């Protein structure tokens, strides 16, 4: 993964995401609600624990998290969401995976299709691009204020069960197998580290650089997808410079 830092890609769109923080919290609340329907105790519900870690890493207020859990525990309205994944291509052959939580599949399918079609992309069949991605645990630790050197941290992370560590001037990026994610996170947390990002995510096996003439359409497609209330995550194999 060297040279293809997910953190760089995150930072590449960070300003736009910061301006939509309330929408990020709204989507996380839906994800917490769905996970909490399997049980309100994160110690007994790994799915809830994962999404709570994700929410805390982006500074979602504890009150918001608690409200979503309480809503699930007291849900008598029949409110329910289905998990749906869409696959396709952005302009220039960039692979795109869209994960959604929806209470109306027809609405979401229509909105996602429009976002692709209006911006030079095309939706594909199930399996058309998912084989290009691997699911991994992902932890980001900001280096500011840390005294640990690169070799020492890498040894700590590997001993905790990490598969790989990437180092840059600003951050340590830690990658794990999905099943080892919680154990690695807990071990590093107990060692005193805090996380700027803590999540299970999808990573491209091969990256694809966006041609300059496709950049505007690509950006518009990403904005349209991320603005959709039903869309939880958008993954691409675009290399963002």
Curated annotation (Swiss-Prot):
Pfam families per UniProt: TACO1_YebC_N, Transcrip_reg
Subcellular localization, as worded in the UniProt entry: Cytoplasm
Signal peptide positions on this chain: none
GO-annotated molecular function: DNA binding
Superkingdom in the source lineage: Bacteria
Compositionally skewed regions (Polar residues) per UniProt: 1-14
Record's keyword terms, sorted: Cytoplasm, DNA-binding, Transcription, Transcription regulation
Gene Ontology CC annotations of this record: cytosol
Gene Ontology BP term (one): regulation of DNA-templated transcription
Chain segments annotated as coiled-coil in the UniProt record: none
Family: Belongs to the TACO1 family.
HAMAP family assigned: Transcrip_reg_TACO1 (MF_00693)
Protein name, entry field: Probable transcriptional regulatory protein lin1570
Organism listed in the record: Listeria innocua serovar 6a (strain ATCC BAA-680 / CLIP 11262)
């Amino acid at each position: 993964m060297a040279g293809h830092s997910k953190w760089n890609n995150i930072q590449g769109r960070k300003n736009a995401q910061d301006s939509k923080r309330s929408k990020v919290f709204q989507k996380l609340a839906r994800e917490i609600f769905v996970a909490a329907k399997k049980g309100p105790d994160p110690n007994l519900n790994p799915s809830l624990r994962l999404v709570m870690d994700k929410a805390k890493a982006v500074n979602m207020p504890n009150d918001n998290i608690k409200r979503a859990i309480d809503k699930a525990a007291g849900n008598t309205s029949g409110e329910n969401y289905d998990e749906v994944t869409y696959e396709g291509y952005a302009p220039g052959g960039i692979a795109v995976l869209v994960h959604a939580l929806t209470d109306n599949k027809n609405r979401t399918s229509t909105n996602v299709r429009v976002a692709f079609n209006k911006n030079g992309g095309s939706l594909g069949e199930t399996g058309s691009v998912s084989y290009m991605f691997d699911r991994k645990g992902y932890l980001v630790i900001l280096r500011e204020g840390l005294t640990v050197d690169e070799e020492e941290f890498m040894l700590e992370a590997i001993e905790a069960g990490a598969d790989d560590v990437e180092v840059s001037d600003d951050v340590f990026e830690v990658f794990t197998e999905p099943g080892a994610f919680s154990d690695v996170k807990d071990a590093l947390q107990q060692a005193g580290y805090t996380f700027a990002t803590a999540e299970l995510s999808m990573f491209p096996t091969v990256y694809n650089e966006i041609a300059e003439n496709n950049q505007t359409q690509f950006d518009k497609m990403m904005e349209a997808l991320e603005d959709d209330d039903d869309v939880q995550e958008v993954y691409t194999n675009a290399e963002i410079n």
